[in-house]
């Protein structure tokens, strides 16, 4: 199984794991489950960190590298197909990062781990 983490889920893994349902933690820790973080999430965290809206205990690049090395996290790049697919995505959600993450989960056939209730309005295999 391929699991794509929404940005807040990635941050909660480090700072508030109690907010994540146990079945998602089990998937995250399952060696047979490939866990991904979108480059869109990294971009979002960098912007929020620079604006003072997100405080990190490590520089972002170190945080990402640590999770990749320690937990096998993989980075999902942004492809042109992901961008073009946004054209057909209904506008239930206005956040550009969430919209891109949603499209990536759809096109890459990934389960999307997110507490964002707006995602239920889309054809995505979401879990929470």
Region spans (language model):
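Active-site neighborhoods of divalent-metal-dependent phosphate/nucleic-acid chemistry enzymes
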Residues: 55-58, 70-115
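Residue-level signal for well-ordered alpha-helical positions
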Residues: 16-17, 48, 89, 125-126
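Generic structural signal for small/hydrophobic residues in well-ordered secondary structure
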Residues: 6-8, 45, 86, 105
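Short, well-structured N-terminal submotif of metal-dependent ribonuclease cores
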Residues: 1-38, 51-66, 108, 117-121
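Acidic active-site catalytic centers that drive phospho-/nucleotidyl reactions
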Residues: 6, 44, 98, 116
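Basic, glycine-rich
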Residues: 120, 125-128
